[in-house]
Amino acid sequence: MTKRRTAILQCVAHFAAFGASAASADLENENLLVTAPPGYKVGFSDKKPNMVMTEFVPAKETVENWTEMVTVQVFFGLKATPQQFMDDMAKNWRAACPEVAEAHTVADAPENGYPTRVWLLDCPKNPQSSKPEITWFKAVQGNDSFYLVQKAFRFEPSKEQITQWMSYLRKVSVCDSRIAERACPKTAN
């Protein structure tokens, strides 16, 4: 990944976190299009050579004490399929929470030309928090990177909450300025 592309991703994440327009220049190359949920703040972010991650929590919560969380991850250069990633994630969840059932696939179809999958994992009682943890995942296999957005609850969400967050995940997408059929939207100047 070039330094310029890393800077663009950081700008998109930074401006999305504060609800502003994505950037003053058009997006270049492959990008994850995701916004910070209204009423959420950045609780944690980390950048490593092969991955960037941002965790959003409700404005009055922290990543140490949360009831809801949205996690956005970009794995640079990862060539896994959404199915492979889901299988690995489910295996890791079962190791941490023996009560986890199999991953439940919600959607498995290309979006904007990219292999995409949405699934659910449910831990009835997380051994670390002693609370339930229910998480929906949306994974997109890009050409340059692998993208994952998670919505987690530490309680049983209502049907209205599930509908709201499925709508949020539907809006998450990947674009690429180098491929006409997958072009990125023009940003505000």
Please give the residue ranges for each predicted region.
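Surface-exposed amphipathic alpha-helical segments
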Residues: N143-N189
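Mid-chain, structured segments of secreted extracytoplasmic proteins
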Residues: E68-A109
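Signature of long, low-cysteine stretches enriched in small and polar/charged residues
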Residues: N92-K138
